Amino acid sequence: MKCKSWSNKINNYVVRKIKSIKINGTQQQLQLPGSGASGIAAAAVITVASDCGENCSSNGTEHQQHFNIATTTATSATEATMPAMAKEKASATVSLGESNFRDINLKDLAVVVEAASRLHHQQNVCGCGAVSSTENNNNSRYGSSKYLTNGHTSPLAAAVASNSSSVATTPHCRMLHNCSLQQYQNDIRQQTEILDMLRQQHQQGYQSQQQQQQPQQQQEQQQQQEQSQQQQQLQNPAPRRSPNDFIFGRYIGEGSYSIVYLAVDIHSRREYAIKVCEKRLILRERKQDYIKREREVMHQMTNVPGFVNLSCTFQDQRSLYFVMTYARKGDMLPYINRVGSFDVACTRHYAAELLLACEHMHRRNVVHRDLKPENILLDEDMHTLIADFGSAKVMTAHERALATEHCSEQRRSNSDEDDEDSDRLENEDEDFYDRDSEELDDGDDEQQQEEMDSPRHRQRRYNRHRKASFVGTAQYVSPEVLQNGPITPAADLWALGCIVYQMIAGLPPFRGSNDYVIFKEILDCAVDFPQGFDKDAEDLVRKLLRVDPRDRLGAQDEFGYYESIRAHPFFAGIDWQTLRQQTPPPIYPYLPGVSQDEDFRSSYTVPGDLEPGLDERQISRLLSAELGVGSSVAMPVKRSTAKNSFDLNDAEKLQRLEQQKTDKWHVFADGEVILKKGFVNKRKGLFARKRMLLLTTGPRLIYIDPVQMIKKGEIPWSPDLRAEYKNFKIFFVHTPNRTYYLDDPEGYAIHWSEAIENMRKLAYGDPSSTSAVSCSSGSSNSLAVISNSSAASSSNSPTVKRSSPVNAPQASTASDNRTLGSTRTGTSPSKKTASK
């Protein structure tokens, strides 16, 4: 067959040589001396071709060079056996590629040759890089006899066997190899232990980190939930509220342009206090800014402990509606009026709650400017809630900076300035005055009169339509407000001192017949502390009632945290962190000890049926509380079968009336027989007033100012009225709305208690469940006020007329046998300030 190219010749030669090797084995190699070189050349060509096939994606130029070198080697190695060709054909380029070997299926042969080359290298080079003795011993001429000594019949067989053979090494290398292997295993073991330890530490750190991050994650989840809820609310806003969503019940408060109702949400059945502001009155009184400010501040203070929450607002064509928290126990003032004064423990607790409320407000740059007992509400747990932010002020950053550097103005002391102040107070408009601030009801049942120095009633009588130019209430306003000074949080600290004084003493510290007198006392800081006033409380009040705002206790403290006030001895023992979670001390009828006298508390339990209701009895009581007069409905008369010394027939009544006409007190009895009379000291807190007390056949208990000869009021009669004597001088008279503290200087307290109880049984019967006269020691303290009511004043107590003639002896005391004159003496219509 004629060959057309060198490549075909080489291919054919290689194929023949491979077939010869397979058939003849070693003998073929021995017969052909040049076969070794030819085999090597062929193997080289095949190896290069295989490498080219495997790395065909690499640089083509380098592979082409390798192929050319292999071709040259193969040509030089086979010159002895290959026939000579023409020179022009011999100079042709020889090209060996993968396609040539693919055609004759020599890929398997390339793999075998590569394995043989690897075996040769492993057997002749040890692990340390030195040439082994096997290579030196087998350096024969042909280099093929070493395969025979190893038991292989051909290089191919040796190549196949090399896949399972180990590396040929020297003994020294094997020893080094074993040491290295052992060291490697030890390193692996140590690294595994270190990894296990690190893994445990990582797990522990991860768990602790998870525990630390858990609260933060919960907060983040809550924030995300709140944000999602807000987004949902924004996307799906709640339907607008209207008056039709609430059932309006009784009204619980009234202002100059608003009325507060108790209402029930028809959807949730929750009770709310809804303040209804009439738009017409707001425009007439120019209260637009007050309404906006109140809404803004209430939104800011909502969900803050100690403040009334604003649930929602809405409006219609006539009114604006503020839906607020309903304070079930009402405001604090009726409690002070009811029990006369708080004990020290009760005062300490509520003063601490007010201090916390001031800290919350001032931390948010809010100054209330009208703190007073009427604006301090009590929830169902008897904790305080601050309300009525119509006079509040939100301080800007600039105003707050000025407040810290505030210098008080010079006090106005000369008479010219006083005259100017008087003119200003009489002529300027009023921003604070409303019906709520007009009425300070101390619980006395008077004929539109006030027994003691009640400033608010005197304001109303002095100038009912007078206007003033400041924001606040007269008894609690600070000097800097009267002097038109900058408004600072110290104004609320002044009011706090006034409230602490009133809780202990029973009356505000500044009192007078009109606003001007009160303002003069405030500017002079004329505070009188009666006997029995707690010393620590007195020190606290003195440090709070300073004319210069900078000198007040707490004024130099950081905004929102009054550390100096908290550290005052009066607040010793207060746990500020859990104050609002504690149960407040019960409010007992309390008579502070004066001089050497002991403190007295009552043991009689007042009926707790003062909650608002819809029956006729409750409506009558609410109506009397709203109008400030007693009920005109006569209580049913229950006849007692037992003989009573006060049960007089008509003839006896006429005889007694004729005898008492010459008595100067007859004119105050309104045609009724005076059964018992005597001078008593009527106590309210730490203040006492001398009064003439009359017990008549009404039954009525009338007390009169013996100096001015003015009827001051009456103690309202009811089946629930009880008398309780504490000793020979002091006795209490309990009514559903108030406890009256009376002191008989002549020592007839027991006689008074028996007389009052006999008259009650005569008028209303003698139920077996009630005792005749109550007596308890001064240490008893079981009487607690458990529900709220307005202290109802009554000038016309229900009178029960007796018609059946029953013989009865006259009163036992000498003062009861005095005759009365036949003519009625007129009384002065005016009322002057009682002496302190």
From Swiss-Prot:
SMART domains: S_TKc. Keywords: Apoptosis, ATP-binding, Cytoplasm, Developmental protein, Differentiation, Growth regulation, Kinase, Nucleotide-binding, Phosphoprotein, Serine/threonine-protein kinase, Spermatogenesis, Transferase. It comes from Drosophila melanogaster. Coiled coil: none annotated. It is found in: Cytoplasm. Disruption phenotype: Death during the second instar stage. Residues 416-452 have a biased composition (Acidic residues). This is 3-phosphoinositide-dependent protein kinase 1. The PIF-pocket is a small lobe in the catalytic domain required by the enzyme for the binding to the hydrophobic motif of its substrates. It is an allosteric regulatory site that can accommodate small compounds acting as allosteric inhibitors. Residues 246-571 form the Protein kinase domain. The gene is Pdk1. Residues 277-322 are annotated as: PIF-pocket. Its EC number is 2.7.11.1. Residues 206-235, 788-797 have a biased composition (Low complexity). PANTHER family: 3-PHOSPHOINOSITIDE-DEPENDENT PROTEIN KINASE 1-RELATED, SERINE/THREONINE-PROTEIN KINASE. It comes from the Eukaryota.
